[in-house]
Amino acid sequence: MAESEVTHIRYLIVLMLFIASTFSYGDRVVLSIAAGDLSRDLHLDPLRLGYLFSGFGWAYAAAQLPAGGLLDRFGSKRIYGISIVCWSVCALLAGVTGFMAAIPAFYALFLVRLVSGFVQSPVFPGNGRIVAAWFPTSERGRASAIFNSSQYFSLVLFAPIMGWIVHAFGWKECFWFAGAIGIALAAVWFKVVHGVEAHPWISRAEINLIQQGGGLASLDAGSRPRSNTLTWSAIAWLLTQRMFVGIYLGQYCITTLTWFFLTWFPIYLTQTRHVSIVKVGFLAALPALCGFAGGILGGVVSDRLLQAGHPLSVARKIPIVLGMLLAMTMVACNYANSSTTVMLLMSLAFFGKGFGALGWTVISDTSPRDLIGVNGGLFNLIGNLAGVTTPIVLGLIVKRTGSFDYALIFVAATALLAIVAYLPVVGEIKRIERPALPGVSS
């Protein structure tokens, strides 16, 4: 291959991010699809099921900062690949808990979900870091939208499959299936993914295109361990930046929507709309497909606005605000009588959530070059506190009220709060660099 020929390896890389993220979210989908049968076997009420859903979120959120630091120190390929192997093993172990008595099985499954959340923590900080390295600024919105849309595609792909497996075999087999395909994915990951300048299939012309367009192509070329003091001082500095605080708050709100759809939405269909478990798998895929389309379209629209000459702030904020307004329409489900109307409203809300989910694009646009992994970890930590609070709060609301009406109001209110976070709080979206610290060499 001539070095002057522009290869397109960056598109292969974002495809790998999309596949890996789809499998990661697929691991989370398993529990929500299997929740009905699992709850009966383990005798779980809605609140205890909410705690089980949140087990992943506790560890996932807590591990974000260590994960970001590991990515910055040792590079994305290695840490991400190890993550895939470990979460696949956790999925296999989750299936084994089905052979235990109900009470020990609950605690064992909760522990396995904690560990799974911990080992999956590098996925999205790694995605943001890899996109920042591999893509010029003008393509970053689409690239981030592609991997971010995996959360919807995972429902489209895995909800019907897992629904059928639960119906035909049982909930244990769902976890074993997820673990087996994860191990296969890890083998492909280590073969295909490399740093920009180290990739054996890339041409010099593509490297130049990435670098000249604002991509951080040498990001993993010199990863070095750094002191904990420097890392913690960097975190403290990030938390003093109003723009980042607004972005973190917005991500928490948007992630609340994600966790509703990943955890309680299938149960809403079975308990409130009286849909069978087999049909739930297919019906849950319909709004997810709309979310997938919205996720891709949101990134495309944002990049088109940027290419048309609009400021970065305008190009990123317009899809976010419009998307959150659409997501708020789920409240109308409280007044809908037919399941068809509910599915249309949820599809519109899911489309809006996908259209507005540009948080990772904004983080790639704004993070200091030497703190992309750490800032991505902090961003994902705060965002995924919603993975802890949302399942429990919704479970508590459903248990206390006996319906999902106030649960949907709560979720829609967080979409409104996301708009507040991005409009008055964030301000101008731009990359900022950390001031040099005394006695620290660059």
Annotated model-derived regions:
Residues 31-35, 237-296, 356, 360, ...:
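Extracytoplasmic gate region of multi-pass secondary transporters
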Residues 54-69, 285-298:
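Central cavity-lining transmembrane alpha-helices of secondary-active solute carriers
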Residues 85-102, 324-337:
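C-terminal ends and interior cores of transmembrane alpha-helices
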Residues 90, 104-122, 340-356:
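Hydrophobic core of transmembrane alpha-helices in multi-pass small-molecule transporters
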Residues 112-152:
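Cytoplasmic helix-loop-helix junction between adjacent transmembrane helices
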Residues 147-200:
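Helix-loop-helix hairpin linking two adjacent transmembrane segments in secondary transporters
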Residues 295, 364-401:
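A late C-terminal transmembrane helix in Major Facilitator Superfamily
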Residues 313-359:
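C-terminal transmembrane helical hairpin of 12-TM major facilitator-type secondary transporters
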